[in-house]
UniProtKB/Swiss-Prot annotation:
N5-methylglutamine PTM positions: 237
UniProt cross-references to Gene3D superfamilies, sorted A to Z: 3.30.160.20, 3.30.70.1660, 6.10.140.1950
Listed name of the protein: Peptide chain release factor 1
KW Cell membrane (keyword) present: no
A Pfam family this chain is assigned to: RF-1
Organism per entry: Saccharophagus degradans (strain 2-40 / ATCC 43961 / DSM 17024)
Lineage of producing organism: Bacteria, Pseudomonadati, Pseudomonadota, Gammaproteobacteria, Cellvibrionales
Length: 360
């Protein structure tokens, strides 16, 4: 491993020890903000240092094995050869894991997200599939201990949603769901199809990290038009008799957001402002990324909503992610929320791209 990487790891190990000691300091414990920040740093460093300690242990074992190999006793030499082979085999995966752990972190990875699903081509069938995708993401979120809040919804005439916007809250939400932005295509026989013909429909998914503060995108209140209207209902549970729903229009960009989930106009306005800030922030990031884009396009997560990223073929029970040529014949499990088998290969490919870029 490169000397510069080992030097960085040694520095991180010293910092890990320092943070652990600080968290036991009564003055730090009494300062909730400081204690929380240190706790977050400790949690981020812990997997790196654990892997680094394992790496050092294996290096020590290799050194001991080499001593045994030079022993005059044949049995000791044979034992040394076995230990050397075993530990050298363990060293390479640990080096790779350490390099992955040291990759630059996406500053948005720890953020909550706004997840938007919209029916595209396919009419009623596309709206029904939007509902299927919403349930798939909701079940995956539940398995991860995340919370899903509906911000606004426009239900389809025969089920599902023409559009549904949700907020997903939890640890590391964006780090996993950021790969879901794009066009999702479904191939199946609709219930209303008497000839048994397969229809193709599509939905678009957009995943945006929640903006920390409105200041991030400098929203000027003079640039906002605020309209109130009567909510059609929150999650289908009640009909609001007051004009508590909020529609915000950002005049310079034309971006419009709505929130009608809460009974309180104040709460709806706060959620709508958060969604607006996130959309504007994402637009700024996409513009900057486009300006700085390299000639080599990343295989994973361009985030273009028109880019077809995945196909769900029901007759074949198949899910195909077109970005990495991944095909799984476990459609039922995926639609029930077992998204990990799709997301993890995308994460692996993304990290491989980062490692390749570092070595260039």
């Amino acid at each position: 491993m490169k000397a510069s990487i080992l030097e960085k790891l040694e520095h991180l190990a010293e910092r890990f020890t320092e943070v652990g000691a600080l968290m036991g300091d009564p003055d730090v414990i009494s300062n909730q903000d400081k204690f929380r920040d240190l706790g977050r740093e400790y949690a981020e460093l812990e997997p790196v240092i654990k892997c680094y300690n394992e790496y050092n242990t294996v290096l020590g074992n290799i050194a001991e094995a080499k001593v045994l190999i030079s022993d005059s006793d044949p049995d000791m030499r044979a034992m040394g050869q076995d230990e050397l082979k075993e530990n050298e085999a363990a060293l390479e995966p640990l080096e790779l894991e350490l390099q992955k752990l040291l990759l630059p972190k996406d500053p948005n990875d720890g953020k909550n997200v706004f997840l938007e699903i919209r029916a595209g081509t396919g009419g009623d069938e596309a709206a029904i599939f939007s509902g299927d995708l919403f349930r798939m993401y909701s079940r995956y979120a539940e398995s991860k201990g995340w919370k899903v809040e509906i911000i606004s919804e426009n239900q389809g005439e025969h089920g599902g949603y023409k559009e549904i916007i949700t907020r997903v809250v939890g640890q590391g939400v964006y780090s996993e769901l950021k790969f879901e932005s794009g066009a999702h295509r479904v191939q199946r026989v609709p219930e209303t199809e008497s000839q048994g013909r397969i229809h193709t429909s599509a939905c678009t998914v957009a995943v945006m990290p929640e903006a920390d503060e409105m200041a991030e995108v400098n929203i000027n209140k003079a640039d906002l038009r605020i309209d109130t209207f009567r909510a059609s209902g929150a999650g289908g549970q009640h009909v609001n008799k007051t004009d508590s729903a909020i529609r915000l229009t950002h005049i310079p960009t034309g971006v419009v957001v709505e929130c009608q989930d809460e009974r309180s106009q104040h709460k709806n306005r706060a959620k709508a402002m958060s969604l607006l800030a996130s959309r504007l922030s994402m637009a700024q990031e996409e513009k900057a990324a486009a300006e700085q884009a390299s000639a080599r396009k990343s295989l994973v997560g361009s985030g273009d909503r028109s880019e077809r990223i995945r196909t769900y073929n029901f007759p074949q029970g198949r899910v195909t992610d077109h970005r990495i040529n991944l095909t799984l014949y476990k459609l039922d499990e995926v639609m029930q929320g077992a998204l990990g088998d799709v997301i993890q290969p995308l994460v692996n490919e993304y990290q491989a791209d980062q490692l390749a870029a570092l070595s260039e």
